[in-house]
Design a protein with these regions (language model features):
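Charged, low-complexity interaction segments
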Residues: 1-191
Length: 191
């Protein structure tokens, strides 16, 4: 990004991430010296920047896990009913990163994993809403993810389904129906 294309919080986050990456790779520095220290003139600005930075990292982790899941299933695609499981598996977080009790086992471990999958599902679909992040387009907006609808083509080519609908749909070609249905479904999903 160019420094003028985002807001101050976005630019500060991107510069901070870049500096942290460079510091981690600088083997001339001792590990405890590889830190970034930032100053601000008030608590409100500090809180805003910390929240922005945390959100940026969370979204980057979520999107990278979604991208890896999609790439791993490129040939078959991923249906919505297993999407969160695939993203959860791609995320591959150690249990201590998301469980209040890192020693959790058995049914409690399964329940803890399920809770994280539900949060991931919510966050995935919320992130896919268009226009929600102005300076950070989602994977679909970036062309890295394509959403398709099960049986849409079969539905739109089945003439008997369209017999008692509006005359415009009855007389439309299957290709036109597919385009119309996809636009409508995309709009409903994004809004």
């Amino acid at each position: 990004t160019e420094l003028s294309s985002g807001g101050r919080s976005t630019d500060t986050t991107i510069l901070s991430m870049s500096l942290i990456r460079r510091l981690r790779n600088d083997l001339d520095l001792q590990p405890k010296a590889r830190k970034l220290l930032s100053f601000t003139d008030n608590r409100q600005d500090a809180s805003l920047q910390a929240g922005h930075f945390n959100d940026f990292v969370e979204i980057a982790l979520l999107r990278s896990a979604l991208y890896r899941a999609v790439k791993a299933n490129e040939q078959t695609g991923i249906s919505h009913d297993v999407l969160t499981m695939k993203v959860f598996q791609s995320l591959d977080l150690p249990v201590e990163y998301y469980a209040s009790d890192p020693e959790v086992r058995f049914a409690q471990k399964a329940e803890t994993d399920r809770a994280l999958r539900e949060v991931l599902g919510y966050r995935i679909y919320r992130d896919l809403k268009r226009g929600w992040r102005i300076t950070s387009p989602n994977l679909e907006q970036s062309g890295l993810l394509r959403i398709e609808y099960a049986s849409l083509e079969e539905l739109c080519t089945a003439e008997d389904v369209w017999q008692n609908t509006h005359e415009v749909l009855t007389s439309a070609s299957p290709e036109t129906r597919i385009r119309i249905a996809k636009v409508l479904l995309d709009y409903m999903r994004r809004e």
